[in-house]
């Protein structure tokens, strides 16, 4: 290294050569904090809300990092705390993994706090432990920020660290119900993530947009609490917060914010009759049900609509149970004889039952609309593009309409509304409408399996149902006339098409029958010389002209005879005709014996 020096005596500049080595430029690290923690959370339990599993992963990750970096905290017997310092992130031996240690420590403390939050519903004392763990997470987050603010990290890492620290402090203050400071921290994190996402490429912006949207419910809840909840225009916002699962004590919140409104809702007017509403839970539910339509109008996705309706159905179930408990306490209301006027409480129960069935029907119609996004109807020319999801078959839609018809049948059987002719006619017309849709999709199912005649019959029945439904009185809550008209116009064209296919199928079957009979003959040529037929097999190497080996023919064989009579036949004796042993002539052996003197015992 060459250094220029001024000589104080002469004033000349002299060059001095040093033997010190040239300093290497320090490394600059880039840590994608949000991307890293989101990947870890999705892979280790938070996809299913399992914070305990994620906390265990963080502990194992910290242990592996310290072991790999040879930076333990003491030995097996003694613990000696060793925090990460800037020395490990600068110089020749700088390693980016050192910055992961405080980050994973903060994530571990946060995961433990969220686990305690789930358990604090049944054990309130755990909230103290929860707050302590969040404080610990904030401590590690500040330690992370102190390291990231050095020159060892680039601007993106510093921005991500700032947003992460603000979010962690906002979460702590949110649990401490310090609404003003919580809102400030969360808003700061939201602004940083939003601006950071705009500066990144398009393929990386989606993660930051999702994170920005996560702050919106908490910020609105903080703003609501800061304003004291006096604004009645934010009731629908609170209900949307409930749909997103942010509020755990919605019943207490709604009872505090809707006191004045619930006092005005002492009676309901339904189908020309006023009924007093006494249970507090029912009043709160009715207010929520009134605001549901506004929330559904703001929502465009079918999944979000279904979730909102299902939450209202759960509240409706609790309200119905409250009314039934009140009926059980009054012996006069337990039984209702035929012809007797329905009491106010029982009429209220009928009204709540109607809300439950109508909202269930609305939920099922949302399921139908969701299924139609991935269904291709060959009869509708106006249908543009089918979704990329799983292909929906016509029998799936027919099954959904079958469930809807069961729901309509339950609506007809609501206690207290059997004698209401107007109501019964509306529900009956609704049932006919859904029967038309069901027959239409069953016909499409039959067309897929080439049953043209049955499809024509079901098209005709669907057309009759649709025409009858259009003539009847429609329900004010379910306007399905436009869909019925589309179905009728589609049936008018496809019915004749299916009929034509059925006629063609009959003609083809007759022609194919005669053709197959003539073509399936296997007689050789010499047996069918009087018949003309273009037989391509005669031009092959093995033409069917004459069969040299005759076919085997069955012939009668010798019958099997079982001679059972021989068992009982007594044959005459032949002993008298046999030659006796004494008369048998002497053999040559006896002659030799006698001649030689041995064997003759008679001379002795």
Swiss-Prot record:
Keyword Aminoacyl-tRNA synthetase: no
Alphabetized UniProt keyword annotations: Cytoplasm, Endoplasmic reticulum, Nucleus, Ribonucleoprotein, RNA-binding, Signal recognition particle
GO cellular component, one term: signal recognition particle, endoplasmic reticulum targeting
Main location: cytoplasm
Example of a GO biological process term: SRP-dependent cotranslational protein targeting to membrane
InterPro entries: SRP68, SRP68-RBD, SRP68_N_sf
GO-annotated molecular function: 7S RNA binding; endoplasmic reticulum signal peptide binding; signal recognition particle binding
Protein name: Signal recognition particle subunit SRP68
